[in-house]
Amino acid sequence: MDNFLAQTLAGISPDITQGETESFHWRWQMPGVLELTPAVEVDRALVLSAGIHGNETAPVEMLAALLSALFEGKIPLRWRLLVILGNPPALAEGVRYCHSDMNRMFGGRWQMFEESGETLRARELEQLLEDFYSRRKTRIRWHLDLHTAIRGSRHVRFGVLPQRSIPWDEHFLSWLGAAGLEALVFHQTPGGTFTHFSCEHFGALSCTLELGKALPFGHNDLTQFTPTAQALATLLAGEKPMEGGTRPIRYRVVAQITRRSDAFVLCMDNQTLNFTPFKKGTLLAQDGDEQVIVTHDVEYVLFPNPNVACGLRAGLMLEKLA
């Protein structure tokens, strides 16, 4: 399967939609979706997704390089693998989304948005995961959704984990550290992200990986993501990651800043980095008569964005875990 990324960006369906290499069978399912099934029997299923936001290109380039290595036989495949480029039209245009933010739509929340290409795609991707995870009995299910952040960050690479009713598998968290993540953020409530969906509905060990800052195709320095790319290659091959490295700092979400009206003001400048700390009593945002104030001794901001639509999240506030 040559030129998967180029064909996806061009909106071209391949002439040949399935085939085999020495180590796996591959099948093109729809634009931006490729399934690889190892020739040997495995009990592990992995979803690797990127491009849910079309301006976040570094992870897409990373996935394209991993696919090339798989097809060239440089990496043996020891997982059932589903590769998803989430929003091909937005990727082609170089925009975050064409109509609405798809990463707020999963878990059926697409029904709450005006119908668009993104709502239809979110519905398709939900069905794809249903088919993929249920087709064969698998002991281990992982989903890694690769993103980049709009803003710079005090942690260049970090992970955001969905709410989960049972404790997290420490092996999974250790792998995230081996993949170069400097911090892990744990959600406490449900949400509409792709990883919330896979975790809640299929019991997958899921994480949104934030890898640097959003840049156009061709402008990414992929060397800064070498630890992540190497960890993914090792994972696909069924090998254990290298031991050692620094344990990621852990945070949990303690509050959400929501823009409720056009009067909303975020009391941070546009250069405020992710994980910037704020002391207790600091005014974070104002929306008419409503004020959002830091209530813990120290809280750290994540994803501050005053330009979201009314009713959507304009930021998260975090607390550092011991």
UniProtKB/Swiss-Prot annotation:
Belongs to the AspA/AstE family. Succinylglutamate desuccinylase subfamily. It comes from Citrobacter koseri (strain ATCC BAA-895 / CDC 4225-83 / SGSC4696). Zn(2+) binds at residues 53, 56, 147. Binds 1 zinc ion per subunit. Pfam families: AstE_AspA_cat (PF24827), AstE_AspA_hybrid (PF04952). Gene3D superfamilies: Zn peptidases (3.40.630.10). One of its GO terms (biological process) is arginine catabolic process to succinate. Its EC number is 3.5.1.96. Transmembrane segments: none annotated. InterPro entries: AspA/AstE_fam (IPR050178), AstE_AspA_cat (IPR055438), Aste_AspA_hybrid_dom (IPR007036), SuccinylGlu_desuccinylase (IPR016681). The active site is at residue 210. This is Succinylglutamate desuccinylase.
